[in-house]
Amino acid sequence: ARKSGGDIHLLVAGSNCTAAAQEAATLSGVSTVKVADAAHYQNQTAENLTALIIANAAGYSHILAPATTFGKNLMPRVAALLDVAQISEITGVDSQDTFVRPIYAGNALATVKSADAVKVITVRTTAFDAVNRENTAKIDSIAAAADTAQTTLTNRELTKSERPELGAAKIIVSGGRGLGSGENYHTLLEPLADKLGAALGASRAAVDAGFVPNDYQVGQTGKIVA
């Protein structure tokens, strides 16, 4: 966001999200944190968050989100309603309208220049250094958009692990179909991951074979980790 120029405003939407907003205000470079606190933002559905972003999009030249499952679900909706092209998974910023993104499963890099008035972008966060927390940004409350009631969350499964989260891990031990079975996967890879303090990952083939759950999957069809 800093490389794109201009003031940086951070949107926090949730239910009882004051603590999250205060934490966001400490991020270096952020000038204003805008907070929409309403019950229908608790489950972070893309439909409701899209309506909120569109209602507050006026005056912004760039709208960014991480290239996570969340961002990939949200930002295409935003781009479509603004009638602009989304720029996906950028790994570099050349100027305010020119960005670098991987193509062909990461085997090449494309430099993309956007002529749209508003740039809607997802960011591959592992390509950028984390900012420090030496800031006290202004926190403003904004009105919540109406509940679209288009989607209802019926269930959420939380996977708990003492290992690092895949998307943020510095070291990942990953295995594929060649391990032969889920038992071999755990027997061979877990001790190594324990020694290295690493996260565990797996190929799509290993996940499809049932060796591990799909939240272990890394790569083009899983979590992007490099």
Describe the predicted segments one by one:
Residues 2-226:
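N-terminal glycine-rich FAD/FM-binding segment characteristic of electron-transfer flavoproteins
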